[in-house]
């Protein structure tokens, strides 16, 4: 015999438990919550009537979502436990007594919402139960029509049966919007659905037959349609082909394609385009691909059709241009023919045409005069508007006491001969101070010219003569040095241009009150005095680190500068590079060697660029330094002169060895025989030549665990190196140690400042002891010194002790009692959380 399942417990779903947790009296409360979330009918309601309200879950939801001063009435056959701000009645909604009781409670009020979640006692047969529920819904609708206000809502539960459609038709006659829905809280196996009726029409008179079950649920005989009625008598007209179109293949000409108003529609109907015009066929746009596409348009894709449209556009432009040229030629020929005919005409015809020409000239002259008058009037209006606008501005300035009455706006501009505002740069200032030198220029132009200016073109000619005198190798060397020299000149000219631009931006007539370096330092101090840099400013160690980093960077850069000349051959230093270094050195000093010349150039560049903006100097350093670094870091390179520059080899990077590697290294370093034996033993039966990735990972891991040869290392040595490795791992990294030291230093500094403030508070005489304690507590709290974590002592409880545990002997402060059960519960909770995470993934 089969075992019957527990029906009651299986129906306890998540909404059942949610109702228990939130305090609702039934799980059906969530149905109303979901309906209200979708249709929003409770927030605006001021009065509500709940029919079949027991046990009161829907009343609880209504009291929660409706305004506080709302009127809520609940009716049911069974008594309902009292709820705050809710009136409950124990009546039968199908009787007249219930209607009288509701009128007594509501008085003259009309409700905005009527709810009905009622259902009869079920269990006899499904047909009887469905009819009883439909009858109960009809009675609820009758009450709703009596007490519902215009535009109100009626929400009811209905069973899906054959009486559902008649009910829906009655709802549609009385309400503006009727929607049937099934909320998520309603069980899937349940036959209930909820009908939301909104916008009550409130008719003056409702036919009583609507609420009569015999009439409302009366079966209507539907006449069956015969076969002749189902078959359509007239055959519909076939669509898809044009009338009179007997063929599906349409051949058109290219001229029709060019004249088509809608080319896309033309291509959809055409099958082939014939290029019948010889001139269009010879056009450059008519390629072989276009000819192939024109042969069968129905098989073309989007790309080919777009190419045909572009081809049509080009041809239309060509044809339009050709027609314009023909029209111009025709006009010229016609004008020449008319002149000939005019010469051959009689004098009488000329006399008849003269009056007409004179009339045209007179009319044209009058039109020109009218246009000139209109332009003059417009110009006068424009000047008048401008004058009025200036007067209005002047009047406003006088009213605001910005100007004197006798001063006009026209006097504001500097129209004098000596205007200081026009001087915007150093060059203009020099021109003003020098005066007019045009006379001197004319005097110098009259003098005979002894000096000869050699242009760049003549220099190029000298270069060509030099090329003929030198060997190819010497010529290559000279050209290389010349290129380097030109690069240096370009950089120096760029720096000078930047200087000139800065001088032009600054007004030379304005004398700065402070020097530029002092002004830049004050601007930097003003920037770093903001609140966001307060913590950085207080930390002395941060400034120390920055200064140390700058010193280290300078020393490394000087070292690189000193290493570069050492790597060059001696002949490269003395013979070839000495002219270059002499060019780079300052004019007032002479370089004794190539290295001194290079350092001299560096110093000159630094001094020259220090006055310029910091960003430009940093960009120059960044653009020069990496070039030198790249030349050193890469392999040996041969310069244009044929000399090989030997790079400085960086030391090899050390590998980080594990304890096993350290022990093997000690064995290898101890004796050559042990090293040789170790190498020989590395070729054994456990050694294979598989590539990485050929074997599965689980197989490789298993081989490493079970098929490995023991190394000739003792346990003591391995333990020694493991201990040493653990000590190394226990040390904090440099950054962590520095951060901890900085944190400790900040805390000590903060503690010292707080101690000084506390001494000042203690020495104050004007305040009481209680105020002193409060101020000291606030000082230590702001300093972050009173935020010590409370120490918790864990006490393991024994079995049979019970819930109340006394403080054990020797335990001070806060303590917590734990047991093995709590540990197991925590582990179970962690396992559940892990399972939930895996399910979400």
Curated annotation (Swiss-Prot):
Biased composition (Basic and acidic residues): 816-832
Chain intervals with Basic residues compositional bias: 805-815
Coiled coil stretches, renumbered: 356-404, 733-771
Superkingdom classification of source: Eukaryota
Enzyme class: transferase
UniProt PTM comment: Citrullinated by PADI4.
SUPFAM superfamilies in the cross-refs: S-adenosyl-L-methionine-dependent methyltransferases (SSF53335)
Record-listed Phosphoserine modification sites: 333, 335-336, 347, 356, 547, 578, 638, 670, 682
Localisation per UniProt entry: Nucleus, Nucleolus
Keyword Membrane: no
Protein name: pre-rRNA 2'-O-ribose RNA methyltransferase FTSJ3
Lineage: Eukaryota, Metazoa, Chordata, Craniata, Vertebrata
Underlying gene: FTSJ3
């Amino acid at each position: 015999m089969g075992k019957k399942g527990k029906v009651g417990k299986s129906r306890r779903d998540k909404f059942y438990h949610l109702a228990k947790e939130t305090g609702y009296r039934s799980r059906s409360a969530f149905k109303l919550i979901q309906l209200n979330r979708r249709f929003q009918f409770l927030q605006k309601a001021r009065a509500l009537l709940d029919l079949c309200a027991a046990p009161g879950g829907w009343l609880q939801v209504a009291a929660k979502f409706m305004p506080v001063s709302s009127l809520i009435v609940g009716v049911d056959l069974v008594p309902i436990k009292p709820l705050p701000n809710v009136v409950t009645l124990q009546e039968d909604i199908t009787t007249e007594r219930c209607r009288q009781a509701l009128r007594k409670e509501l008085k003259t009020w009309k409700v905005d919402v009527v709810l009905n979640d009622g259902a009869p006692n079920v269990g006899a047969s499904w047909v009887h139960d469905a009819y009883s529920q439909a009858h109960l819904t009809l009675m609820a609708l009758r009450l709703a029509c009596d007490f519902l206000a215009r535009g109100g809502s009626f929400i009811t539960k209905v069973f899906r049966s054959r009486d559902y459609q008649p009910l829906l038709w009655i709802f549609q006659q009385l309400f503006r919007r009727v929607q049937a829905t099934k909320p998520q809280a309603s069980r899937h196996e349940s036959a209930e659905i909820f009908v939301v009726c909104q916008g009550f029409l409130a008719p003056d008179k409702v036919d009583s037959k609507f609420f009569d079950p015999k009439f409302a649920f009366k079966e209507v005989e539907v006449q069956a349609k015969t076969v002749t009625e189902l078959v359509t008598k007239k055959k519909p007209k076939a669509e898809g082909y044009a009338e009179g179109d007997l063929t599906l293949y349409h051949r058109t000409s290219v001229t029709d394609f060019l004249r088509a108003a809608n080319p896309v529609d033309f291509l959809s109907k055409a099958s082939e385009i014939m290029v019948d015009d010889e001139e269009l066929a010879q056009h450059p746009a008519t390629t072989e691909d276009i000819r192939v596409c024109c042969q069968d348009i129905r098989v073309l894709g989007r790309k080919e059709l777009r190419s045909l449209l572009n081809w049509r556009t080009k041809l239309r432009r060509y044809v339009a241009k050709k027609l314009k040229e023909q029209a111009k030629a025709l006009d010229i020929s016609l004008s020449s023919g008319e002149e000939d005919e005019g010469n051959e005409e009689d004098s009488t015809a000329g006399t008849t045409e003269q009056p007409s020409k004179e009339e045209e000239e007179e009319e044209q002259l009058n039109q020109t005069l009218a246009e000139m008058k209109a332009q003059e009037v417009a110009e006068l209006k424009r000047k008048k508007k401008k004058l009025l606008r200036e007067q209005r501005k002047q009047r406003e300035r006088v009213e605001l006491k910005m100007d004197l009455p006798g001063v006009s706006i026209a006097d504001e501009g500097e129209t004098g001969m000596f205007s200081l505002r026009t001087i915007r740069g150093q060059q203009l200032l020099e021109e003003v101070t020098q005066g007019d030198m045009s006379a001197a220029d004319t005097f110098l132009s009259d003098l005979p010219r002894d000096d000869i200016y050699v242009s760049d073109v003549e220099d190029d000619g000298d270069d060509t003569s030099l090329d003929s005198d030198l060997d190819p190798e010497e010529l290559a060397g000279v050209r290389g040095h010349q290129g380097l020299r030109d690069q240096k000149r370009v950089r120096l000219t760029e720096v000078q241009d930047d200087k000139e631009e800065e001088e032009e931006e600054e007004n030379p007539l304005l004398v700065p009150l402070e020097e530029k370096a002092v002004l830049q330092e004050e601007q930097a101090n003003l920037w770093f005095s903001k609140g966001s840099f307060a913590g950085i400013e207080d930390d002395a160690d941060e400034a120390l680190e920055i200064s140390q980093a700058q010193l280290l960077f300078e020393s490394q850069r000087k070292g690189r500068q000193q290493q570069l000349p050492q790597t060059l051959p001696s002949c490269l230093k003395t013979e070839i590079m000495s002219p270059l270094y002499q060019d780079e050195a300052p004019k007032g000093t002479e370089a004794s060697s190539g290295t001194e010349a290079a350092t001299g150039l560096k110093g000159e560049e630094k001094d020259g660029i220090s006055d310029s903006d910091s960003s430009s100097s940093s960009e120059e350093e960044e653009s020069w330094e990496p070039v030198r670094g790249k030349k050193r870091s890469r392999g040996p390179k041969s310069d244009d002169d044929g000399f090989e520059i030997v790079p400085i080899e960086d030391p090899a990077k050390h590998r980080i060895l594990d304890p096993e590697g350290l022990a093997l290294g000690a064995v290898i370093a101890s004796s050559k025989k042990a090293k040789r034996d170790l190498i020989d033993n590395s070729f054994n039966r456990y050694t294979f030549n598989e590539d990485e990735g050929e074997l599965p990972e689980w197989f490789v891991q298993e081989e490493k665990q079970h098929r490995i040869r023991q190394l000739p290392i003792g346990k003591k040595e391995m333990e020694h190196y493991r201990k040493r490795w653990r000590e190394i791992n226990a040390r904090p990294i440099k950054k962590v140690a520095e951060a901890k030291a900085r944190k400790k230093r900040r805390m000590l500094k903060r503690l010292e400042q707080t101690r000084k403030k506390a001494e000042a508070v203690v020495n104050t005489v004007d305040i009481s002891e209680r105020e002193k304690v409060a101020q000291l507590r606030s000082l230590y709290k702001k300093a972050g010194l009173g935020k010590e974590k409370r120490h918790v002592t864990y006490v393991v409880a024994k079995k049979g002790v019970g819930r109340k545990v006394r403080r054990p002997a020797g335990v001070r402060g806060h303590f917590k009692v734990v047991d093995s059960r709590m540990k197991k519960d925590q582990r179970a909770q962690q396992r559940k959380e892990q399972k939930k995470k895996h399910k979400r993934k």
